[in-house]
Amino acid sequence: MIVDSVSQKPTTLVQKTINIYLCGPTVYNDLHLGNTRPLIVFDVLNRVLKKAKYTVNFVQNITDIDDKIIKIAQQQEVSESVVTKQQITAYKSLLKKLNILPIKHIQITEKIDKIPDYIDQLVNQNHAYVSTQNNVYFAVNSLKQYGYLANRMVHLEETDTDKKNKLDFVLWKITTAGIKWNSKWGLGRPGWHVECAFLIDYCFKNELTIHGGGVDLKFPHHENENALHMALYNQPITKHWMHIGHLMIENQKMSKSLQNFLLAVDFLNFHDFRVLRWIFYQKHYLHPIDLNQSLIEKANNDIQRIAKTLNVARTWLVYSEQSELISPKQYDPVFSALLDNLNFANAVAAIWKLIKKINTSIKTKDFSVLREQLSFLEWSIDLLGISFKSIHTKLNVRLIKEWSILHKQKAMDKADQIRKKLIKKMLL
């Protein structure tokens, strides 16, 4: 079940094929931490849907032509493709570092030659017009549903540009700067809003299940995408909307324009990727998160606590000779929480309750119960994308078994020497 962020209504996903479109980056520089929140939230959604036996088609655009890209290319005296190729490589590397499951990426430049025909349909239906300077604009007053997403009324406002209405937005921009494409209106480039609307139409037609992005995209970007689709098909561009809350610093949205951002790659140079993911699980995805040092430290401590629980539990199962073929097992309290509109609070609470039970089983040496509890924990953290690689190497397992034998033989001095080694290795 998800709650539509526009209608505010809960919806059960009935169809077994789920089509997702998440607005992607404009690749002119590196992502800041705020940009990663939608990626991580939608990655969990993707994991949950797949575990629930849905077929998921997950598409994300990469905007690889834009005024910012052209400006940087000119400053560096290179082509736009040199800039974007470097940034796309960096972006995909970041996705791997964040443990994001594979997404189908489509670069806008790969499909631009098809966009003029899409725009021409809007012109022919009188939803778009060609200006005196041969730019093509969408006429917002041609669509009575315009303003639906943002819940605002649209009034005709005069403008001193070649647009008829201040809110009209560009579909095709005539330009002499940077890379250009041919069209019946002249050399130029498509506008940002029409790029996403076209890609959704190209990939899914009228079958998009969930459209997502940061809450700041709700207006004007998603409003304008939706308007284009409504104009052509007389129905919304997607069945459901998911908007992700801001990442804040000192009560201000983290953004490049405010110069209050921290690059994701810089954060990951000092912190485990699991720390960032865990931070985003501390609030519902709709709500803003205020990033501060205490939150980072708490998340770091939490991740270390989870890792230690896994390591110690595995060690005791080796000790008790019950460590063979432990496979992750579905844990309903975590799964149910995430199926309920990604209720991170309940999922996290369920994990802490499970860890408490694991510690009790270790104390009481109830190893058969511990074995099942560990399989629950491994399944749960995999669902959240924060799994750990086992540190129980052959050498470490041999050391644990040696400790086990000495401990059971009551050779306490020798056993304690090995125990200290195990503690140092984070195995106890």
UniProtKB/Swiss-Prot annotation:
Molecular function, one GO term: cysteine-tRNA ligase activity
Cofactor comment: Binds 1 zinc ion per subunit.
Binding site for Zn(2+): C23, C196, H221, E225
Gene3D superfamilies: Cysteine-tRNA ligase, C-terminal anti-codon recognition domain, HUPs
Assigned GO CC terms: cytoplasm; cytosol
Annotated residues for binding of ATP: K256
Predominant cellular place of this UniProt entry's protein: cytoplasm
Necessary cofactors: Zn(2+)
Pfam families assigned: DALR_2, tRNA-synt_1e
Reaction(s) this enzyme catalyzes, per UniProt: tRNA(Cys) + L-cysteine + ATP = L-cysteinyl-tRNA(Cys) + AMP + diphosphate
Its EC number(s): 6.1.1.16
Location in the cell: Cytoplasm
GO biological process, one term: cysteinyl-tRNA aminoacylation
Family: Belongs to the class-I aminoacyl-tRNA synthetase family.
Record-linked PANTHER family: CYSTEINE--TRNA LIGASE, CYTOPLASMIC, CYSTEINYL-TRNA SYNTHETASE
Name of the featured protein: Cysteine--tRNA ligase
Organism in which the protein naturally occurs: Mycoplasma genitalium (strain ATCC 33530 / DSM 19775 / NCTC 10195 / G37)
